[in-house]
Amino acid sequence: MKKVELVFIPSPGAGHLVPTLQFAKRLIDRNDRISITILAIQSYFPTTLSSYTKSIAASEPRIRFIDVPQPQDRPPQEMYKSPAKFFSLYIESQVPSVKKIITNLVSSSANSSDSIRVAALVVDLFCVSMIDVAKELNIPSYLFLTSNAGYLAFMLHLPIVNEKNQIAVEESDPEWSIPGIVHPVPPRVFPVALTDGRCSAYIKLASRFRETRGIIVNTFVELETHAITLFSTDDGIPPVYPVGPVIDMDDGQAHSNLDQAQRDRIIKWLDDQPQKSVVFLCFGSMGSFRAEQVKEIALGLEQSGQRFLWSLRMPSPIGTVPCDCSNLEEVLPDGFLERTNGKKGLICGWAPQVEILAHSATGGFLSHCGWNSILESLWHGVPITTWPMYAEQQLNAFRMARELGMALEMRLDYKRGSADVVGADEIERAVVGVMEKDSEVRKKVEEMGKMARKAVKDGGSSFASVGRFIEDVIGENSGFK
C-alpha cells in the first residue's frame, strides 16, 4: 500500500487554523497511510498560535509544518476595513511561494519509489486561489470549510445570483430564498462585506467552490439535514463531506497568552458555583465593545440576578486582536466590582472557552455565534443567546434561532463597531431567558449534543463521511491504492 501526503493550506487565525489541525489529526488517526503537511501562511498581524502549532508538530510525527515565506508586496493594512478582500489579496500574494513548495514536494516524491506521494491539496475558504496551483500540478483539490452547511449554501448561491443580476445588497432589500436554507434570509443578516458595498471579494471566493473535487464541512448531518440532503441531490455541486463537529477539546494550547494562574482562578471560581447557574459571556478572538456598551452589559447582568463569568476585552487598533482591560474600574459602573466580583460574578480577560462550556456550573452562553463556539456549546449542551459581531456570525445567529430553534434571539444583525448600543434591559431579558432551566431551546441543545457525540464515533454519520473522503483520496479510483 502506498503512503500518501495531503497538503493543507489554512488561512492564518485561530478560527481557521485550529479546526484544520484537528481535522488533520482525525485523518491520521483513521488511516496510517496518511501524513499531513500544513503550509503555514504567516498572519499579517501578531498572533499567539506559534506555540500551538509547535505542540501539534511535537506530538504528531505525521503532521509537519512548512512556513510559507512572507511576500514582499503585501496589501496595505488600511484594506483590512474589508477583511474578505484583504485576506483574499494577502493569500493571492502567497501563490508563487506555495507553488514552489508544492512543486518541490511533488518532484521529490516522484524521484523516489518508496517516498510518500502527494495525493491532494486541501484549501481553506480564503485560499481558493491555490486551486490553480493544484490544477497546474495535476493534483486534486478539496475545500475545507470551517463554517457550516448553511453558509456553504449561501456561498454557492452568490455566483448564481450575480450572473443574473450584478449584486449590490442593501440591508433593506427583500429577503432571499436560498436553496439549502429553510427560511428566506433577510439581507440584514448577510455577511457584513455583502451589505457594505464590498461584496466582490466574496463572489470571487464563492465562484471557485465548484472547481474542487469535494467540499469538507465542519458540521454533521443530524444538525443540518436540510442543506446536506440538498447538496447530495445536486449534480452541479461537488461531493460534500460533513465531518463535524471538529473542535479542539484542549483550547488552552491554542491560546498561549492565557497563563495557568488565570485559568486556575476561573476554574476554581466555577467549582464553587451551583450546577448550571452561571451565564458565560465571550465574543471570540476579535470581539470587543466600547466603554458605553460595557456599562450596559454590566447593568444588565446585575439586574438579571444571575451568576456570570464575563470575558471582557477592549477594542484595539484596526486589524489587531482586542486586548484585556487594564483598568476595570474605568469602564464599569461605579461600585459594580464591589457588588459582584467574586460573589455573583467573575470578570476575566481571555478565557479557556471549551473548559468553561464543559464545566457543570455553566448554564448559558451569551455568544458572538462564531461557528466553532456554536459547535462547542452544542457539544456540551449549553444554550446560546445571540450577539453576532462579524464575518458570517449574523447568518449563523439567524439560522440557530429561527431555523434550528437552538438559540435564544437577542440580536441577529448587530455588527462590530456599531453605534447602536444594546441596553441593559434587553441584556437582562436575554440572560434570564438563556438561563431558564426547562426551556425548549435547552432541551433541543442537550439532545443535539448527544447526537454530535454519536456522529463522530464509529458508526456515526461524520465518522462515515470521513471514511468516504479518505476513500476518495486514496481508494480504488484514486491511483493510490
Swiss-Prot record:
GO molecular-function term, one example from the UniProt record: UDP-glucosyltransferase activity
Listed Pfam families: UDPGT
pH dependence: Optimum pH is 6.25.
UniProt EC number: 2.4.1.-
Gene3D superfamilies named among the record's database cross-references: Glycogen Phosphorylase B (3.40.50.2000)
Keywords: Glycosyltransferase, Transferase
Domain of life the protein comes from: Eukaryota
Residue positions binding UDP-alpha-D-glucose: 285, 350-351, 368-376, 390-393
Temperature dependence comment: Optimum temperature is 25 degrees Celsius.
Role this protein plays: Glycosyltransferase that possesses chalcone and flavonol 2'-O-glycosyltransferase activity. Converts phloretin to phlorizin (phloretin 2'-O-glucoside), a potent antioxidant. Possesses glycosyltransferase activity toward quercetin, isoliquiritigenin, butein and caffeic acid.
Homology family: Belongs to the UDP-glycosyltransferase family.
Protein name: UDP-glycosyltransferase 71K2
Record organism: Pyrus communis
